[in-house]
């Protein structure tokens, strides 16, 4: 079969996505490849189809066990013989997989990079025909990447020990120029075909919010996405448990995931999330790299991550099925202090020299500053991310919180003087909330308790809403005219940079929002909800019966296509996106009766 027949028969698609056909052609012709494609862009098909077109077995190197299991399960569901060999298998299961591989029963074998160091595995690979080697999450080979793994440095050594070097391809969703150079050199790619299909995920809406109360804001987001799958990322284990408890107390069941939990609990919680037994999971960045769940509708970062690589990969776990999804970051300046603490106390690079550690620390601070720049940007957030990865755009996306606000260049000199004066006159011992209350002329209990109503700055900004004052204070912090202490209750202090403003020696202009963010409704392909829910119920039943996640049976996109096309025979069912020959044979009889019944009732 040719590549188009394979695409339809096994994956149920009629055409390739951007870049896929070009990559497949180059790998199939025997050329190494470096492919940078966005999450959800269809990377795996780029090596799976060449594997099906070739004699022998493809070796896929993947960093996480859970991802291997999901991908192999999906391939088997599609009628493709594949296996994984890792530490979750018993010795007997590993022996069976190796025996089957030697008999040529598989087209793909998934392994972790650590497996390559085992002499027995090298012997296996030299006793069978290897069609190709695909390195997934290839950025893990680079010290400049956001998820460096020393085991990835052993890949080129393994390849060099093979009797016959196969074609080698490397895939990643995020790679700066420095990371890209490392991938090329450290994996030993030979005259590779290089392609970047673009980092943009057009179906994702990006938003940065700076709420006074993060919990209240989170509740609003979760409420807007009721009954939808969502991931909430926190910077620390303590925050994970605190946020999860808060959600549970407010009627939203949530699971937790962090490195402090036992393997059994982590595995169970991940499994419950993937299998739709619980819609929400609150986690540290230990969660998600091995998750292939396509119908995550929103990702919230309760705390700012350490760099844009981490952020884009974690946010990119939303909407892998191409449906519109939200990525919201709840930012506060205190998040910066947390990340600085992590950088200063990073012991992951203990085996490196002092000079190397300092170099990495300097790079980490540079990346942190870029991350803060994203959080404080008043220009298009999507362009900010894409520019960081070397993909330059000038037109606004109109699909992020910055683009949905209207900004105006405003002279804020006088208001800034009022804020700075208030901080000084109250002894530089209060936080944002109290300072804005004084300026607004609040009559709260705390104001009278500390006699702040007697201050000369009391009420001098009473013509402005508290939210406007808070926003300006935040912007002055961003511009380093004010600093915040790192205490449990952060206190505002003026910096040396502020004195020319206070003395009237310098004016200050800022781009301030003059129109609040427009509300963006979540939009999906219009389908009948009654039928869609019935198809989801059938999918869940079949998934539970087969002990696989629901999306392995069919994605939401496939169910929506069924709702739109209403197939009533097997030939029509084959025209549904994501339905190949194997799934037609297996599932047409399960879904067609539901569709027929719906049509009879409806029409």
How would you label these PLM feature ranges?
Residues 1-3, 337-338, 349-353, 363-365, ...:
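Accessory DNA-binding and partner-docking regions appended to nucleic-acid-acting proteins
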């Amino acid at each position: 079969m040719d590549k188009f027949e394979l695409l339809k028969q096994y994956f149920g698609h009629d055409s390739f996505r951007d870049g896929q056909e070009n990559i497949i052609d180059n790998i199939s012709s025997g050329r190494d490849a470096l492919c940078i494609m966005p999450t959800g862009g269809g990377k795996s098909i780029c090596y799976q189809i060449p594997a099906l077109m070739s004699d022998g077995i493809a070796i896929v190197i993947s960093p996480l066990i859970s991802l291997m299991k999901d991908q192999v399960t999906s391939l088997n569901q599609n009628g493709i013989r594949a296996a994984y060999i890792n530490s979750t298998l018993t010795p007997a299961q590993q022996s069976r997989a190796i025996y089957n591989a030697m008999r040529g029963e598989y087209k793909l074998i998934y392994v972790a990079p650590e497996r390559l160091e085992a002499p027995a595995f090298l012997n296996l690979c030299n006793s069978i025909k290897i069609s190709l080697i695909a390195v997934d999450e290839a950025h893990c080979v680079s010290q400049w990447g956001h998820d460096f793994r020393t085991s990835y440095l052993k890949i080129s050594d393994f390849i060099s020990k093979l009797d016959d070097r196969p074609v080698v391809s490397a895939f990643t969703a995020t790679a700066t120029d420095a990371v890209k150079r490392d991938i090329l050199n450290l994996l030993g790619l030979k005259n590779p075909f290089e392609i970047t299909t673009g980092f943009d995920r057009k179906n994702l809406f990006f938003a940065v919010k700076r709420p006074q109360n993060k919990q209240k804001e989170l509740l609003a987001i979760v409420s807007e996405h009721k009954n939808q799958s969502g991931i909430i990322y926190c910077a620390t284990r303590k925050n994970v448990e605190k946020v999860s408890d808060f959600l549970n107390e407010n009627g939203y069941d949530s699971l937790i995931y962090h490195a402090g939990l036992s393997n059994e609990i982590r595995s169970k919680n991940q499994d419950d999330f993937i299998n739709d037994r619980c819609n929400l999971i609150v986690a540290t960045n230990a969660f998600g790299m091995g998750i292939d769940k396509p119908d995550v509708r929103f990702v919230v970062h309760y705390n700012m991550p350490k760099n844009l690589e981490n952020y884009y990969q974690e946010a990119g776990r939303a909407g892998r099925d191409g449906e519109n999804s939200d990525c919201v970051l709840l930012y506060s300046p205190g998040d910066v202090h947390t990340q600085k603490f992590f950088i200063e106390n990073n012991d992951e690079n203990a085996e490196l020299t002092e000079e190397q550690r300092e170099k990495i620390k300097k790079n980490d601070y540079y990346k942190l500053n870029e991350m803060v720049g994203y959080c404080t940007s008043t220009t298009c957030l999507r362009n900010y991310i894409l520019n960081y990865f070397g993909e330059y755009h000038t037109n606004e996306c109109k699909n992020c919180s910055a683009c949905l606000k209207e900004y105006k260049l405003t002279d804020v000199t006088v208001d800034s003087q009022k804020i700075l004066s208030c901080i000084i006159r109250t002894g530089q011992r209060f936080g944002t909330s109290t300072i804005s209350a004084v300026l607004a002329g609040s009559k709260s209990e705390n104001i009278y308790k500390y006699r702040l109503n007697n201050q000369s700055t009391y009420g001098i900004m009473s013509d402005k809403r508290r939210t406007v004052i808070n926003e300006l204070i935040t912007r002055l912090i961003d511009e380093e005219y004010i600093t915040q202490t790192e205490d449990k209750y952060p206190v505002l202090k003026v910096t040396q940079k502020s004195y020319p403003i206070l003395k009237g020696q310098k004016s200050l202009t800022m781009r301030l929002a003059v129109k609040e963010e427009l509300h963006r409704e979540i939009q999906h392909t219009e389908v009948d909800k009654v039928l869609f829910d019935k198809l989801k119920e059938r999918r869940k039943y079949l998934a539970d019966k087969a002990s696989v996640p629901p999306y392995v049976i069919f994605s939401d996109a496939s169910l929506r296509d069924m709702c739109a096309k209403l197939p009533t025979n097997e030939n029509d069912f084959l025209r549904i996106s994501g339905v190949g020959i194997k799934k037609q044979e297996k599932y047409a009889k399960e879904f067609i009766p539901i569709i027929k019944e719906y049509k009879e009732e409806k029409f």
